[in-house]
Every structure is written in C-alpha cells, then in structure tokens.
Amino acid sequence: MRKAERARTTNETDIKLAFEIDGEGKADISTDVPFMTHMLDLFTKHGQFNLTVDAKGDTEIDDHHTTEDIGICLGQAFLEALGDKKGIKRYGSALVPMDEALAQVAVDLSNRPHLEMRAAFPQAKVGTFDTELVHEFLWKLALEARMNLHVIVHYGTNTHHMIEAVFKALGRALDEASSIDPRVKGVPSTKGML
C-alpha cells in the first residue's frame, strides 16, 4: 500500500500526519487553524486520498508555523508514499470552478521541486487566516514532495472560493499524477529515473 506517516515536533508546532495515496477520500483532520482544516478536508476528498492530521501550533502568534509545518509533513509523506514511482502517470492537472472562481493546477512528480503560482486574492484574510499562507503551504508541499507545481487562479471575486478551488484542483491533479498506469513500464522518464 502506498502510504506514509510523519511526525514533527518543534518549539512552534506538534504535528502527526498519516497519508495514503490509494484511499477513499477519508479525512480526519484536527488543527488549530480552522480554514486549513477545511482546505485539507477538500484536498483529501477530491484527491480520493486518506489523510489524518493532528496539528497544534503557536497560533497565538499567527497561523504561519502550523500551516507551513503541515505542508512540510504532507510533502514528505506524499514523497515516501510514492515509493520508487514505477508505473505512475507522473503528470496531472485539473481545472476546477467554485462558483465565480476558476483555479487550475498542473503537477509533475519530477523530483525537481518548484512552485509557480499566479493568484491575486482580493482579501488579505479569510476569517483569521492570512491568505499569503496558501503560497507558503504550497511551496513547502512542493519542496518536500519534490514536485513541480503550477497554480493559476484565473479569476474570482470571493477569496474563500478562489482558495477552495485551488485545493480541490490540487487534490485532483495529484490523484491523476500519482495514479498507476499499467502501460507505464518502470518510471515515466527517458532518463530511466525520477
């Protein structure tokens, strides 16, 4: 089974995370960052993963450390769960509407971490959540999972809807990229490795 667990304890956060690629969209998420909890639920459901997260952090300061460290743990668990990457599709993309917002995510599980993000959120906060943390989370996810991740929010007026579309598209794109294609022999690269 393609799954992995991660634990990370620092002076700022305490995180336990379990991730399964070939899941059923089951999420058991407990964080002290409610908006991130909501986004991880959406990501899990739309990616058909199984994800358990128990995360506590110094949110009396702000949500930065908790959000960043969840991204680190999820990226590491995703990379480990992929294993040797034999037979995966490698590439995935999704275009997802959420009411008036439209987001697109494209991913390459290339072992070359990069984040390219084009999103102009109209509001700096959704509730108490700083919207700049979306970039922070995605960058740490891409870095630790060693993926090339492109995120474009084409348009939208409601910041919540725009971010929600991103997380749904992220789940769907990663589901596609991590899927096993029986036609693929070895890893999908002319180099013979990823």
From Swiss-Prot:
Annotated pathway: Amino-acid biosynthesis; L-histidine biosynthesis; L-histidine from 5-phospho-alpha-D-ribose 1-diphosphate: step 6/9
Catalytic reaction equation(s): D-erythro-1-(imidazol-4-yl)glycerol 3-phosphate = 3-(imidazol-4-yl)-2-oxopropyl phosphate + H2O
UniProt keyword Cytoplasm present: yes
Any one GO biological process: L-histidine biosynthetic process
Gene Ontology cellular-component terms listed: cytoplasm
Alphabetized CDD domains for the sequence: IGPD (cd07914)
InterPro entries reported in the protein's UniProt record: IGPD_sf, ImidazoleglycerolP_deHydtase, ImidazoleglycerP_deHydtase_CS, Ribosomal_Su5_D2-typ_SF
EC identifiers of the protein: 4.2.1.19
UniProt keyword annotations, A-Z: Amino-acid biosynthesis, Cytoplasm, Histidine biosynthesis, Lyase
SUPFAM superfamilies, sorted: Ribosomal protein S5 domain 2-like (SSF54211)
Principal location class: cytoplasm
Compartments in which it is found: Cytoplasm
Coiled-coil segments: none
MF term (GO), any: imidazoleglycerol-phosphate dehydratase activity
UniProt keyword Cell inner membrane present: no
Matches recorded under PANTHER family: IMIDAZOLEGLYCEROL-PHOSPHATE DEHYDRATASE (PTHR23133:SF2), IMIDAZOLEGLYCEROL-PHOSPHATE DEHYDRATASE HIS7 (PTHR23133)
Similarity comment text for this entry: Belongs to the imidazoleglycerol-phosphate dehydratase family.
Name the record gives this protein: Imidazoleglycerol-phosphate dehydratase
Annotated gene: hisB
